[in-house]
Amino acid sequence: MYLCPRCKERLSYNDYSELREGSCELCGNILDHVEDYFVMFEGEAKKYDFSTFLIGLRAPKENLTKEIELAEKSGVKLRSYKDDFQVALGSKIEAELPYRADFSRPEIVFTVNQENMDYSIWIRPEYLKGRYLKKRRGIPQSPWIKPGKGKEREKSISEYIGLTACDLLKGSDYNFYASGREDVDALMLGNGRPFYVEIKNPRNRTFDPARISEEVLKFSGGGVEVIELSLANPVEIEDMKTLRPDKTYEVGLTIEGKAIDGLEEILKKYSNLRINQKTPRRVLNIRKDKLRERTIRSMEVKQYKDGHLVLVIRAEAGTYIKEFITGDNGRTVPNLKDELDINVKIDYLNVLEVK
């Protein structure tokens, strides 16, 4: 077996011929190419906005296995040539370029593939969090697409926010996550709805929350506003997915027939009311038909005059408020229509708070 002087010295074992020409049968002379990969890294670095990095080496499995076997045979404890290469290249980058190595959460990972002497770049996504307000009805939260028909509505909240952030951070794509969703014809007011955006492969990490908020408002024609925007991390997204915050709604109703006496006192009886809801008929085409148990925390009368009633309802996450009002042909029980023995029409629905 022929070894380069470096590997022969690392192994402290003299039964191998020293390599004079060609490739080392152990490390493939990868350490002789540190300067070459430094130049490649420097060229890639000009394309991205980052401050931290990590070097990786994808070495052939047989080389690493052979290295372990030789180390055991020679009786020495050594650091792998893979680690030596990563340290050598990383140290040169830190010494000559304005970047620092980060072993926990680097913004760029530069990985050399020893088998084909090529390299790859991984760019850490950027995560943003905030709350959005929807000020115009008719905007869906996610793209509204029907098979064979394409988009049937204007752009969605996820597009207004995600495309804007993606453009300003020069990303390749985005993912949008929110804490629940409001109906397409409902407004999202009050303190807004929590959301996160993941920006993939960002070439710009200069975070300007005021600029993003301004551009979202302009892009949506005033229909979507972003507040409390800040940087986040993926752990926070996973935490948000497990939370089930209560929601507070304002519902405008038209009630037919005679006035209801003592309505406020009647509604107090329904605090912490447990209801059973089957999947609403209006979404059966996209959601599985199943039974859910939910809680109406409280109901208050905000206004009641001339057959027009405005209620403020606080409910458990996942409650279908419209169906609680109308009963959805018996698919939600108990429901307000049957409990008050009224004919009712929903005029509007607003979300006031997402805790």
Regions found by a protein language model. Give the residues of each.
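Non-catalytic RNA-recognition surface used by pseudouridine synthases
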Residues: M1-K355
